Amino acid sequence: MEIEDKIRKAYEESVRVKEQFFRENISLIKEVAEIIAKSLNEGGKILIFGNGGSATDASHIAAEFVNRFKRERPGLPAIALNTDMAVLTAIANDYDYSEIFAKQVKALGESGDIVIGISTSGSSRNVIKAIEVAKKRGLKSIAFTSKKGEKLISKVDYAFAVPSEDTPRIQETHITLGHILCELVEDILFEIPAAKKKLKQ
């Protein structure tokens, strides 16, 4: 295959997957954005996590909430649980790698918080264990995964399953979803005067 054809095939497939995903999930995206905004407005926070490329997506999305996305506004509390090397290696060394997110959810998760687990395969044991802990503690849980992620999908309150088995296409859709959710949450919280008053300035 010529280089130009390979480039064209990659971006066309990326566009196709995203178009199908967002067409099928537009109502769910709106619902989840409202749930996240409600949690943040009532003093909750976001705990988000994943492995590898999904870890960088988690860090990226958390940064957009804590800093800003498109609006000048107060920071919103979001913690990527895959960023603290001391915590991660201590848990993995003393217990098991499958516990690295679950123990953090136990330590940091509080009533009203939102947990977002990102796994392209939907079978990452450490992500699934953390979701199980979140459910036991009464936290709302959201998954970013793919159509093959039945294990994770079955555990969460809200699941976003990308209609692809190609990891790059799945991850490209996940970060776009994260951006859209952040933009919607900003719009909800900072365009509604009543919500603005409740947030800590």
Swiss-Prot record:
Q: Where in the cell is it found?
A: Cytoplasm
Metal-binding: is it a keyword of this entry? yes
Q: What is its main location?
A: cytoplasm
What UniProt keywords are attached to this protein's entry?
Answer: Carbohydrate metabolism, Cytoplasm, Isomerase, Metal-binding, Zinc
**Reaction catalysed by this enzyme:** 2 D-sedoheptulose 7-phosphate = D-glycero-alpha-D-manno-heptose 7-phosphate + D-glycero-beta-D-manno-heptose 7-phosphate
SIS domain boundaries: 36-195
Q: What does the record give as cofactor?
A: Zn(2+)
Q: Which PANTHER family match?
A: DNAA INITIATOR-ASSOCIATING PROTEIN DIAA, SEDOHEPTULOSE 7-PHOSPHATE ISOMERASE / DNAA INITIATOR-ASSOCIATING FACTOR FOR REPLICATION INITIATION
Put simply, this protein is called: Phosphoheptose isomerase
Q: Which CDD domains match?
A: SIS_GmhA
Report the pathway entry.
Carbohydrate biosynthesis; D-glycero-D-manno-heptose 7-phosphate biosynthesis; D-glycero-alpha-D-manno-heptose 7-phosphate and D-glycero-beta-D-manno-heptose 7-phosphate from sedoheptulose 7-phosphate: step 1/1
Question: What is written in the cofactor note of this entry?
Answer: Binds 1 zinc ion per subunit.
Other remarks on this protein: The reaction produces a racemic mixture of D-glycero-alpha-D-manno-heptose 7-phosphate and D-glycero-beta-D-manno-heptose 7-phosphate.
